Swiss-Prot record:
Organism lineage: Bacteria, Bacillati, Actinomycetota, Actinomycetes, Frankiales
Region entry Disordered, spans: 122-168
Organism: Frankia casuarinae (strain DSM 45818 / CECT 9043 / HFP020203 / CcI3)
Annotated InterPro entries: KH_dom-like_a/b, RbfA, RbfA_dom_sf, Ribosome-bd_factorA_CS
Subcellular location, record wording: Cytoplasm
Protein name: Ribosome-binding factor A
Highest taxon in the source lineage: Bacteria
Subunit-structure text: Monomer. Binds 30S ribosomal subunits, but not 50S ribosomal subunits or 70S ribosomes.
An example Gene Ontology CC term for this record: cytosol
Length: 168
């Protein structure tokens, strides 16, 4: 197992070498606008996974994947020359889904913001359904005294929030 700091430095160096070789050394017409986003190494530094993105649609992505697979030997030899390690890591190319996922999340967030704005607009002009007081109270029968109205007539709220009896 290699030192984690050494593995990070080697991963950065592999990313730089692969990116510059793709830019200058690979002449495959299938290779589109490829960006190397990340390289991850196994703890024993034998296998390297190269993450990349491609500008364009699905056909450009597939064509670039085929071009990267055919250029894997050239890229590995360039990595071996540039890094000088005892065992040159085997390169595996994986399309990086992070930008696609981020774009999808941005769309979802914008849709949620639009819905929130619409609901805020509806809420601003909304009024409660029915009466202002949503609780139903039984109506007193003719001749009966409503207990609540009797208490209201007999008591008064003082300045401290308590009730005081009215003298009459």
């Amino acid at each position: 197992m290699a030192d984690p700091a050494r593995a990070r430095r080697l991963a950065v160096r592999i990313r730089e070498v692969v990116a510059s070789t793709l830019e200058r050394g690979v002449k495959d017409p299938r290779l589109g606008m490829v960006t190397v986003t990340d390289v991850r190494l196994t703890p024993d530094l034998v296998d390297a996974t190269v993450f990349y993105t491609v500008y364009g649609d699905e056909t450009a992505r597939q064509a670039s994947a085929q071009a990267l697979e055919s250029a894997r030997g050239l890229l590995r030899s360039q990595v071996g020359r540039a890094t000088g390690v005892k065992v040159t890591p085997t390169l595996t190319f994986v399309h990086d889904r992070l930008p696609d996922d981020a774009q999808h999340l941005e769309k979802l967030i914008s849709v949620a913001r639009e819905r929130d704005a619409y609901l805020a607009e509806v809420r601003r002009d909304a009024r409660p359904a029915g009466d202002d007081d949503p609780y139903r109270r039984p109506r007193p029968a003719a001749g009966e005294v409503d207990e609540l109205s009797e208490v209201d007539e007999l008591s008064e709220v003082d300045e401290y929030g308590g009730t005081a009896r009215q003298e009459g």
